[in-house]
């Protein structure tokens, strides 16, 4: 199966409705935490908490800068990350692979394991095509043209965009920077596998939800529950005690909608037939 997610930061503004993102079928959010050794993204805490509240898997990323102190960058990142999976954004101006590993090791030394690495093929080529076989959770980016809902833009599970490099398979593909999601244009990602496989990639325990509902987010399950309750109420009446306006049955109880329809059918069938 293919699972879709989004990638956001302060560049997208603070007002993306993650409840709507979940309703549109997305299952994960990657959002910016920090950059270099000074910048903390002000949108991160709210997006992190909203992702959790709406059943979306969430990872927070640090944009690694090759011109800033690695230890200071790790300190800043960990200070602002909180309860989320970890991700390194390693691209333009991030330095070479030695800088990448220095940051990964610095984060690991602070008690967190890096789960994901955004390292697009073009940047890998720019730094000399090194071996990246041990890079955790490779996210590669190649963009399709146009702007539309993410599923309409997705190039497919067999797209060459998924081709690995540097001795590493691609774990997640960022395939557009112009997906229309919850009324915003954002980066969209795809993961090939189950939700539990994605959770494992993010260093999270398997879901405890079993059966058909495990394909739904917490927000979608809540929405489904509300709809079922509404349907039950319309059929059975308030508290399941029938509707006073539909009349009473032979036992003096308020009739439900089904009772009333059955009574109406019985009355119609027993009514005298018109003669010509």
For each predicted feature, which ranges?
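Heptad-repeat coiled-coil amphipathic alpha-helices that mediate oligomerization/assembly
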Residues: 209-275
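Short, amphipathic alpha-helical "lid/cap" segments that border enzyme active or binding sites
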Residues: 70-74, 195, 225-228
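Functionally critical loop-and-helix segments that line ligand-binding/catalytic clefts
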Residues: 1-19, 134-214
